[in-house]
């Protein structure tokens, strides 16, 4: 497996993997994968990566700004998605580890993740990479008519902003 920077030509695979995550009902409140323009404007240009296996994109990770306020320029939110046929192979852990390194190279001091409590594998990957549970955002939004909680996790860099 190879972790590399995202290229625009990866977007078809990235969008498909994103939709697979959406379809689980435990990855995001989104109902449909974003098109190129919306996806491209949602994520920081410098922190977008993919996992490639046998020339196939099997996962992706990217950061989005946590806020548009200047004081929070060093705070970003993690998005990470793995193709359903490649779950439980360590791809998510590899992507998150590389994303952390890239984020620190970009001067980002805090990473945040909002995770459905039912998404145990995502919670485990984030915990393994130094994220701590800050709290639960109760009934943050409705999905299919039911209120959903979000586990709020955060990782503070040990090298940036110390």
Regions inferred by a protein language model and the residue ranges of each:
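Glycine-rich phosphate/pyrophosphate-binding loop shared by adenosine-nucleotide-utilizing enzymes
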Residues: 1, 56-60, 148
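Conserved acetyl-CoA-binding loop-helix of GNAT-fold acetyltransferases
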Residues: 88-101, 124-128
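Conserved GNAT-fold acetyl-CoA-binding loop/helix
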Residues: 15-41
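A short beta-loop-alpha structural element at the N-terminal edge
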Residues: 1-14
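Conserved catalytic-core motifs of GNAT/GCN5-like acyltransferases
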Residues: 62-65, 114-115, 127, 132-149
């Amino acid at each position: 497996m190879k972790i590399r920077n995202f290229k625009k030509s990866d977007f078809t695979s990235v969008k498909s993997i994103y939709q697979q995550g959406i379809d689980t009902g435990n990855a995001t409140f989104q109902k449909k994968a974003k098109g190129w323009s919306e996806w491209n404007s949602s994520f920081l240009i410098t922190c977008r990566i993919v996992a490639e296996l046998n020339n196939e994109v099997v996962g992706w990770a990217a950061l989005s700004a946590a806020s548009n306020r200047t004081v929070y320029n060093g705070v970003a939110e993690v998005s990470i998605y793995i193709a359903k046929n490649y779950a439980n192979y360590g791809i998510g852990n590899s992507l998150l580890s590389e994303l952390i390194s890239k984020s620190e190279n970009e001067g980002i001091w805090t990473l945040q993740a909002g995770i459905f409590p039912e998404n145990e594998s995502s919670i485990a990957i984030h915990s393994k990479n130094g994220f701590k549970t800050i709290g639960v955002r109760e009934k943050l939004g409705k999905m299919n008519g039911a209120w959903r909680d979000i586990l709020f996790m955060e990782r503070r860099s040990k090298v940036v902003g110390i």
